[in-house]
Amino acid sequence: MFVRLAKVKDCQEIYDLIKDGDSGMTTLPKSKKEVLERISWSKKSLNKKIKRPDKDSYLFVLKENNKIVGISAIYTSVSKNGTSVFFKRKKKNIASKSFNFKKSLDVIQLHTVKNPYTELGTLFLHPDFRGKGRGSLLSLARFKFMALWPERFDKKIVAEIRGKVDKDDNSIFWKHFSKHFFDDEVFNNNEISYINNSFISESIPKHPFLVSPLNRSAQRIIGVPNDNALPAFKMMESQNFKSNGMVDIIDAGPCLECKLDEIK
């Protein structure tokens, strides 16, 4: 069992691996053509003479018994040519001197990130090959790669962990939050994964939203990782990654970050 960078000859095998993969993982390639584009992007990034972060990607595969059973990736300079949008969960304090009243409210608010960062993503393992340290190996290989060539990466490293979904693989948070802004027929489940930052910025007000009016099931899962992503979440924490208070716009999964030189 070992991890290496993806090669062009891996295209069909990678596509076979991910074609029936997790529909909620928006960074997974959607077609064989896109798989080939990702591999080419990775190869081009690796062969750059000027080794600095510049919208690069590195795609890795995990092989076991001569079979590709998992993939993962690194993306640099995220938000360099456009902002990244999250919800930031925080406390808003209100007070009245007249009535000697104070209260702390739990709110979420759109938060844009403009400074470039490196993102860890696209971690996917075949269901039959999950466990026994495979996910850790696939993920930790990225840290080793970054340690060998730190000049290729931004100083801030971010990992978005998938949030909770229902039995039909729909985002619990989005189901309850979005109904305040959009009709049910605006999106089907597949289209939700293609919602981009521009759409969010244009369609949702910038002021803070109280968490309390949301359905209780939606409130409870803000910033909580999906059960399948919990091992990855714990592994990232063991490597010194910490929550930055931001969550994904769609599934409200937690966002972790760490400085490149502080990763264990």
Spans of features found by a protein language model:
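Conserved beta-strand in the GNAT
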Residues: 59-61, 67-76, 119
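Conserved acyl-donor/pantetheine-binding loop and adjacent beta-alpha core of acyl/acetyltransferases
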Residues: 76-122, 181-194
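A short beta-loop-alpha structural element at the N-terminal edge
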Residues: 2-14, 27
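Long, charge-rich C-terminal accessory regions
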Residues: 181-264
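Helix-loop element at the rim of GNAT/NAT acetyltransferase active sites that forms part
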Residues: 16-32, 42-50
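Conserved acetyl-CoA-binding loop-helix of GNAT-fold acetyltransferases
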Residues: 125, 131-146
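Glycine- and acidic-residue-rich phosphate-binding/metal-coordinating active-site segment common to enzymes
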Residues: 138-141, 148-192
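Conserved GNAT acetyl-CoA-binding A-motif
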Residues: 113-123, 146-162, 172, 219-223
